Amino acid sequence: MERHQPRLHHPAQGSAAGTPYPSSASLRGCRESKMPRRKGPQHPPPPSGPEEPGEKRPKFHLNIRTLTDDMLDKFASIRIPGSKKERPPLPNLKTAFASSDCSAAPLEMMENFPKPLSENELLELFEKMMEDMNLNEDKKAPLREKDFSIKKEMVMQYINTASKTGSLKRSRQISPQEFIHELKMGSADERLVTCLESLRVSLTSNPVSWVESFGHEGLGLLLDILEKLISGKIQEKVVKKNQHKVIQCLKALMNTQYGLERIMSEERSLSLLAKAVDPRHPNMMTDVVKLLSAVCIVGEESILEEVLEALTSAGEEKKIDRFFCIVEGLRHNSVQLQVACMQLINALVTSPDDLDFRLHIRNEFMRCGLKEILPNLKCIKNDGLDIQLKVFDEHKEEDLFELSHRLEDIRAELDEAYDVYNMVWSTVKETRAEGYFISILQHLLLIRNDYFIRQQYFKLIDECVSQIVLHRDGMDPDFTYRKRLDLDLTQFVDICIDQAKLEEFEEKASELYKKFEKEFTDHQETQAELQKKEAKINELQAELQAFKSQFGALPADCNIPLPPSKEGGTGHSALPPPPPLPSGGGVPPPPPPPPPPPLPGMRMPFSGPVPPPPPLGFLGGQNSPPLPILPFGLKPKKEFKPEISMRRLNWLKIRPHEMTENCFWIKVNENKYENVDLLCKLENTFCCQQKERREEEDIEEKKSIKKKIKELKFLDSKIAQNLSIFLSSFRVPYEEIRMMILEVDETRLAESMIQNLIKHLPDQEQLNSLSQFKSEYSNLCEPEQFVVVMSNVKRLRPRLSAILFKLQFEEQVNNIKPDIMAVSTACEEIKKSKSFSKLLELVLLMGNYMNAGSRNAQTFGFNLSSLCKLKDTKSADQKTTLLHFLVEICEEKYPDILNFVDDLEPLDKASKVSVETLEKNLRQMGRQLQQLEKELETFPPPEDLHDKFVTKMSRFVISAKEQYETLSKLHENMEKLYQSIIGYYAIDVKKVSVEDFLTDLNNFRTTFMQAIKENIKKREAEEKEKRVRIAKELAERERLERQQKKKRLLEMKTEGDETGVMDNLLEALQSGAAFRDRRKRTPMPKDVRQSLSPMSQRPVLKVCNHENQKVQLTEGSRSHYNINCNSTRTPVAKELNYNLDTHTSTGRIKAAEKKEACNVESNRKKETELLGSFSKNESVPEVEALLARLRAL
């Protein structure tokens, strides 16, 4: 009683001395002990009756029925033993928070304590007690299962213990609302420092309910203050001190599971922490990187992505690399900062599940300078730093180990460019990726050779490649971290599609343009022809005028109207009428020469009327209509007279009556640009036909003008045109062509030349009748001159046909002979191939077995064309065909049958031979030889000394007959071989031709080879799927283990210990236990690696005990290590749907498959022992294995 007496009387507060208090004085004294810390007016406690010395105190009871939620919170805030250090006083708190109500609740509790508790009320209080003790669900569960009496005793013991240890007697605690009010004041001086320090102590010492009460609103205020301090440009000492204090408060808040979850759920919390990473303030940076490390190891993959996103944003804002500040922290002299930075690096590098991503993060740290710093860090003597460096090196070796196994056990130092190139080349060589890889290297050579620019190019390319190769399942985490090069692959694909369409349209446009050019050229040629016709019309009109002037005009009643003018007689080709003849009559003077064709643009063909003949004097020619007057003072345009025909400019002209007074065309004066050089250049560039330039240009111009008026005498216009084209292409004098034909000069005679001559020359009768025109040679046009020269050659057409046959004979032999040899070789190989015979036997067995009970059962043979139908026979599950099954059987049991693919290789060429065409060409060759022999017999003796036709052709006939006889014999032998094959395989000649027979066999050979490739791909896919499945299972187990480890890190060590969550995480980081635990793997034996390699040759399976193997075969279980004599096949689980494109570590897979590979070796030994027993037992036929497989289909 005496030790409680000082707490019962407070004279300073106006209480009467000796005034007694209720019997629950100890608990009330706890509340009263807080009064001296309160500022402002104080209220004395209510008076109470005196306490008699020696009076027995009533038992402490609590009536829960009357408690509100606030009262329960206050009750749950009772501190258990082991309290933390006291907080410093909070300055300048308002008195509004001081109230006498703080003791009302305990007083009421004490007064109502004797009332009994209901079961629900006590259970509610029990839950509040466990929550206050910061117990997780796993530890709460066994406590909830205890008896009600034990729960009641635990609650009472908890209250009594708290009251005896004085936690109920401490001074009044500052409420969360008071801290929140102070933080809202917005102060940024020493007062804020004191407030934050007091808050840190309160967050550390108060129970979870107090922390939760503050965290609802206080966390946002702390983040607002931190954001304000970071965004401010003031670098004062007090600002950085406040910033550090805020981070310490966040650390204390994160020391509870509630606080840690709230921090990780806040979007801006990680971003602000990343911005607070500043090597210039080592102490603050140490706390920041520790918090980030803890978040990385305790969160899921999404949290890691958010941390990296925060670091990236901070780096972009500072215009530095995102890991620059972390690496700079390693350069600082503070060992604690170096340890914390290595913890964060290990947390970032070891947390991702994907190997590629771990390598990417590690390599980025190395590029930022970590590679140069690591040797210096290893020289520092510090246990904590040594642990972090050891973790970094071990995980680096593990990742390189997994990477090497993924690349088929190729171990190389990836820091050397030559080794990396060889590794990449070995993966793409002889694949479709080879061309793209070479293209990439070629494009790298196009980078501009500049010292500064080249570095930026390679940096940009490296960032692009890193984003592309890390793209997985449409979501690449690095896309979020590298916003500067955020590639929208969907848009890129759309662009590629549009580009493909554009190329297609451009190709069509190019084709249309070519057609347009052809049509345009034809149009220009047509216009040139029209101009020639116009010139001819003008010439005829001039002759008509001369005729009229000589013989008089037509009678007056003979009026032949001319076609009307389309332009009202304003065409520029119209000439003014000449003066009329004298009235006395007589012969008029000759008219002026006809005008030349107009220049392009002066008028279109037929744009004006044909000028009428000048009227005679006695017909009254004075009444011709005058020219129309041009509007707006326009003057007639100058009439140009080019010397040659020009190409036309197809424009739509504007007529004068369509213009206005202010029109541009009224004022133009194009004549100022006229000069002789321009017009000559224009004429030479756009003329319809180029003039041939020779030494004497003037003489040639006269000749060309003279040629234009030459007319065809005897040749048809079409023949003449074709001969003109022929002569213009060869440009050889006519006599020289004649001598080449007479001498049969094969060095100068071309096959195309002879073919054109035969095609375009007139027939022999016309040639014979041209001798009468020899005297008029100079007046003939070029084609007629050429024909006259060639008519001197006797029997020209038979001669040309014989020369053409001689020129083509060697080519015909080279075409016929290989075809005959291909068919003959194919027939021989088909008949003598043992592997092909075995294949037919195997197919016959399978077919008879499958056709059992049908009309096709018990077949003795089948048409070889039926081999092509094997691929049409599907399995029961529609996943394979009989052809693929046959290939698989041959691979497993009869590998020598596969050799028939090489034996029948001549079928590839033979199937392309048309025997009918071959025979036709051979017969035609024989007929041409006979015809040539007859020509030589009846050929007249040569009249010209240069005529060597008979001599050369006689020698050619002898040689050609020998070659023809050889070909005939080869063809006869080919037919005999084919007839032998037809009889050998009982093929109906009437129904199956040689072409069909060879084509069917070649198609079967091609599909058989394709089935081999498809089976290989199928096995690779199955093995890959199995490796992926094993890797996924292993990764899932590791993920669950990591989750359990993270869960254990968040738990308390013992039930009654209140060690913080963040303290446990930091302790795990410091010891290295928090990082990924990837077990060490040893390389597998070479033989096991080969057996598991997807590219290795599949070995032949041994004979199995099929009496016990009656389980239906599935497509996904055809690997050789799944089939053994003592095991049945397990169907592949169809519900598993894995993405085979994911980059799962092959090293992890192979390490997991090592045990299975050992089982494979043991199964092989059992199969070997079983083989011995089968070899002794001859009653088991060898085809039982095949029949068992057939039953499965």
Swiss-Prot record:
Residues 114-476 form the GBD/FH3 domain. Ubiquitinated. The keyword Nucleus applies. GO terms for cellular component: actin filament; actin filament bundle; cleavage furrow; cytoplasm; cytosol; ESCRT I complex; filamentous actin; microtubule organizing center. PROSITE patterns: DAD (PS51231), FH2 (PS51444), GBD_FH3 (PS51232). Residues 636-1034 form the FH2 domain. A motif (Nuclear export signal) lies at residues 1184-1193. The keyword Phosphoprotein applies. GO terms for biological process: actin crosslink formation; actin cytoskeleton organization; actin filament bundle assembly; actin filament polymerization; actin nucleation; autophagosome-lysosome fusion; cell projection organization; chromosome segregation. Residues 561-631 form the FH1 domain. Gene3D superfamilies: 1.20.58.630, 6.10.30.30, Formin, diaphanous GTPase-binding domain, Formin, FH2 domain, Formin, FH3 diaphanous domain, Leucine-rich Repeat Variant. Residues 575-600 have a biased composition (Pro residues). Belongs to the formin homology family. Diaphanous subfamily. The DAD domain regulates activation via by an autoinhibitory interaction with the GBD/FH3 domain. This autoinhibition is released upon competitive binding of an activated GTPase. The release of DAD allows the FH2 domain to then nucleate and elongate nonbranched actin filaments. It is linked to Auditory neuropathy, autosomal dominant 1: A form of sensorineural hearing loss with absent or severely abnormal auditory brainstem response, in the presence of normal cochlear outer hair cell function and normal otoacoustic emissions. Auditory neuropathies result from a lesion in the area including the inner hair cells, connections between the inner hair cells and the cochlear branch of the auditory nerve, the auditory nerve itself and auditory pathways of the brainstem. Affected individuals typically respond to sound but have difficulties in speech discrimination. This is Protein diaphanous homolog 3.
